[in-house]
From Swiss-Prot:
Its EC number is 4.1.1.23. InterPro entries: Aldolase_TIM, OMPdecase, OMPdecase_AS, OMPdecase_bac, OMPdeCOase_dom, RibuloseP-bd_barrel. The keyword RNA-binding does not apply. It comes from Streptococcus gordonii (strain Challis / ATCC 35105 / BCRC 15272 / CH1 / DL1 / V288). Catalyzes the decarboxylation of orotidine 5'-monophosphate (OMP) to uridine 5'-monophosphate (UMP). SMART domains: OMPdecase (SM00934). The lineage of its organism: Bacteria, Bacillati, Bacillota, Bacilli, Lactobacillales. Keywords: Decarboxylase, Lyase, Pyrimidine biosynthesis. This is Orotidine 5'-phosphate decarboxylase. SUPFAM superfamilies: Ribulose-phoshate binding barrel.
Length: 230
């Protein structure tokens, strides 16, 4: 089922920055926010508990990638945090992903990172020695994530249709690299607008800088939400 709220990437260096950002929103506006590695490693689980206490939904994007037993143990802890979604890296393999899903169960959605939206085909070939197209690599990772029992993948909106055709219509596609029309793409190389992501079948979109760096984050959020639901 498609999530109507854009997920806001809280890419901040400090707790105080997040608190200041949230002051732009009414207290009764329950957000869906993403906590990434930088923020989680700087603050720790306290930030998750704080945001859950305010009633917000949490996407914990840690991209776990290690041997199956280690990821299983880590996921057993993360599953106690009350999070709504969490990531592992598909490159860790089917066994690793499967072990993570077994221990997490239905406590949260488990999605796999395929290829980062900052990865170009040249990067993939030179650094990863994967001699296929980005789309072929992403679809292969998606199939493996589905095989492992995961709920979906993180992918560019440009790969959504291919992934759903290769897996299932209800296999979730979480798409970062979303930019409103006319905004700068930054370090993202595979981007789409919120409306385009909706039309192509994305289930969740993740938006960072266009909201958190906006002069008025509340207005920016609602404009992106309107585009996403149009």
């Amino acid at each position: 089922m498609r999530e109507e709220r854009p997920i806001i990437a809280l890419d901040f260096p400090s707790f105080d920055d997040v608190k200041a950002f949230l002051e732009h929103f009414p207290e009764d506006e329950k957000l869906f926010v993403k906590i990434g590695m930088e923020f989680f490693y700087a603050i720790g689980p306290e930030i998750v508990h704080y945001l859950k206490g305010l009633g917000h939904s949490i996407f914990l994007d840690l991209k776990l990638h290690d041997i199956p037993n280690t990821v299983r143990s880590a996921m057993s802890v993360l599953g106690t945090f009350g999070i709504d979604m969490v990531t592992v890296h598909a490159a860790g393999g089917v066994e690793m992903m499967s072990e993570a899903k077994k221990v997490l169960g239905d406590k949260a959605k488990l999605v796999a990172v395929t290829q980062l939206t900052s990865t170009s085909e040249e990067d993939m070939r030179d650094c990863q020695n994967i001699q296929t197209t980005v789309q072929e690599s992403v679809v292969n990772y998606a199939r493996k994530a589905k095989e492992a029992g995961l709920d979906g993948v993180v992918c560019s909106a440009q790969e959504v249709e291919l992934i759903k055709a290769a897996t299932a219509e209800d296999f979730l596609c979480v798409t970062p690299g979303i930019r409103p029309a006319g905004s700068e793409i930054g370090d993202q190389k595979r981007v789409m607008t919120p409306q385009e992501a909706h039309q192509i079948g994305s289930d969740y979109i993740v938006v960072g800088r266009p909201i958190i760096q906006a002069e008025n984050p509340w207005d920016a959020y609602h404009e992106i939400k309107k585009q996403w639901n149009s």
